[in-house]
Amino acid sequence: GFLFSYYWDMILSTKNLRKEVSTDSGTLVILEDINLEVRKGETIAITGPSGSGKSTLLGLLAGLDDASGGEIFLNQHPLHLLNEEQRSEVRKENVGFVFQSFELLPGLTALENVMLPSELNSRKNAQELAQYYLKRVGLEERLNHYPRQLSGGEQQRVAIARAFACESKILFADEPTG
């Protein structure tokens, strides 16, 4: 019983994860021997100086990039064994993102930006979810404002509301506090 529930509570794990890139002067190791376990409901922060590989690690964990070695399991899916199309499907079903640059569409209002991922996934209650999460981040009075009409902090909160509105199993945030 314990091992079974332990395994199914695991939302993300890595074993001996490695990322390297080829350069003119040889192979550069970006990440080496990364072992990580994250259970459902846990929150973790990956910290380190600029250039230490945090964003690279996030890209690997979310299945946005291929590892050079090791294993990555995201909600029991072996990302290290999947091709890009299969990883994309796993992301669609399991992952939400808050990007460093917010990635808001300038021609859409705050409400529409938050609704978009839910609508793309044919969620019936996209508007209700978007309004709920925009209220949770204190932007209920700014629903019909475009990104250019919002401060940087407000744009960031729209991006956070969008990520939560997807109701994903795991949320990745790359420098969510700016």
Task: List PLM regions with ranges.
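ABC family nucleotide-binding domain
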Residues: 11-12, 17-178
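Short, Lys/Arg-enriched N-terminal segments with co-localized hydrophobic residues
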Residues: 1-9
